[in-house]
Curated annotation (Swiss-Prot):
Belongs to the triosephosphate isomerase family. The active site is at 100 (electrophile), 172 (proton acceptor). It comes from the Bacteria. The keyword Glycosyltransferase does not apply. GO terms for cellular component: cytosol. Involved in the gluconeogenesis. Catalyzes stereospecifically the conversion of dihydroxyacetone phosphate (DHAP) to D-glyceraldehyde-3-phosphate (G3P). It is an enzyme of class 5 (isomerase). Pathway: Carbohydrate biosynthesis; gluconeogenesis; Carbohydrate degradation; glycolysis; D-glyceraldehyde 3-phosphate from glycerone phosphate: step 1/1. One of its GO terms (biological process) is glyceraldehyde-3-phosphate biosynthetic process. Keywords: Cytoplasm, Gluconeogenesis, Glycolysis, Isomerase. The gene is tpiA. This is Triosephosphate isomerase. Homodimer.
Length: 261
C-alpha cells in the first residue's frame, strides 16, 4: 500500500509559546493546501507550547498535526516533573516521540523504559514515533543494522499485531544528529529497509508495509528529496531545520513532490 509521507519537526528545547504560535502560523499559511493531501506535516513542540499550538490548530482549523517530545511511563501520581499519556491525549497530540537518542543518552532510557513508554502512548490513542539508531563506533564496526533492529524489536515487545500499525519508526543515526553530517540516501535506505524486514519477520509483511519509517539526522530541504525518494524512507524527523519556518515549509513542500509556488 502507498504510505503517506510524514514530516515531523522536533523543536527540542527551543521556542516559548509565543514563538511557537508565530512559527506554526508561518508554516500553516506558507504551505499550499494541496500539499497536505500528499504529505502529513506535524510539529513537536516542548510541553510548555503544546496547549498554545493545539488552540491555534483547532481554532483556525489548520491542517498541521502536533505532538509531544516525551511521555511518562506512569499514568498519574507522585512523579514530579513527569507528563502522562492521558494529559497529552487531552492536549490533542497525534504523535509522541519515544526513545530519542538524546533521551537514551542524557536520561539513561533503556529499551525496557522505551517499551513502557510506547505502550503508554498507544494506550491513549496516540502514535509513538519510535526512534532507533546507532552511535558512530557501532557504525564503524559494521553493527548498525543489528543495533537498530534490536532496539526496534525490544521497544515493541508485548504489543499486539494490530497496535504495530499505529507505530511510526524513525531511524536516527546518532552520529548525524545536529552534527551537519548526514547519512547518504543509500545509508538511510539500508537501515530503513532492514527495519521494515525485521517488522515483517515478526508481524508479517502486510503490517510491515503499512508502518512508516522516517529518517532523522541533519535533514534539510537540500537533501530531503533524495532521502524520501528511497523505497523504504517515508519521511523525516527534522531537528534544527524545523525551527526555521521558511526552511521547514520548503522541506515539507519538497516531500510532497513540488516546490513552493
Amino acid at each position: 500500500m502507498a504510505r503517506q509521507p510524514l514530516i515531523a519537526g522536533n523543536w527540542k528545547m527551543n521556542l516559548n509559546h509565543l514563538e511557537a504560535i508565530a512559527l506554526v502560523q508561518k508554516i500553516a499559511f506558507s504551505l499550499p493546501e494541496k500539499y497536505f493531501a500528499k504529505v502529513e506535516v506535524a510539529v513537536i513542540p516542548p510541553f510548555t507550547d503544546i496547549r498554545s499550538v493545539q488552540t491555534l490548530i483547532d481554532g483556525d482549523k489548520l491542517l498541521l498535526k502536533h505532538g509531544a517530545q516525551d511521555v511518562s511511563e506512569h499514568e498519574s501520581g507522585a512523579y514530579t516533573g513527569e507528563v502522562s499519556g492521558p494529559m497529552l491525549a487531552k492536549l490533542g497530540c497525534s504523535y509522541v516521540v519515544v526513545g530519542h537518542s538524546e533521551r537514551r543518552e542524557h536520561h539513561a532510557e533503556t529499551d525496557e523504559v522505551v517499551n513502557r513508554k510506547v505502550r503508554a502512548v498507544l494506550k491513549h490513542g496516540m502514535s509513538p514515533i519510535l526512534c532507533v539508531g546507532e552511535p558512530l563506533e557501532v557504525r564503524e564496526a559494521g553493527g548498525h543494522v543489528e543495533h537498530s533492529t534490536t532496539q526496534l524489536i525490544n521497544a515493541l515487545k508485548g504489543l499486539k499485531t494490530e497496535q504495530i500499525r499505529q507505530v511510526v519508526v524513525a531511524y536516527e543515526p546518532v552520529w548525524a544528529i545536529g552534527t551537519g553530517k548526514v547519512a547518504t540516501a543509500a545509508d538511510a535506505q539500508e537501515v530503513c529497509a532492514a527495519l521494515r524486514t525485521a517488522l515483517a519477520d515478526k508481524y508479517g509483511k502486510e503490517i510491515a508495509d503499512e508502518v512508516r519509517v522516517l529518517y532523522g539526522g541533519s535533514v534539510k530541504s537540500s537533501n530531503i528529496g533524495e532521502l524520501i525518494g528511497q523505497n523504504d524512507v517515508d519521511g523525516a524527523l527534522v531537528g534544527g531545520a524545523s525551527l526555521n519556518g521558511d526552511e521547514f515549509t520548503k522541506l515539507s513542500a519538497m516531500a510532497a513532490g513540488g516546490p513552493l509556488p
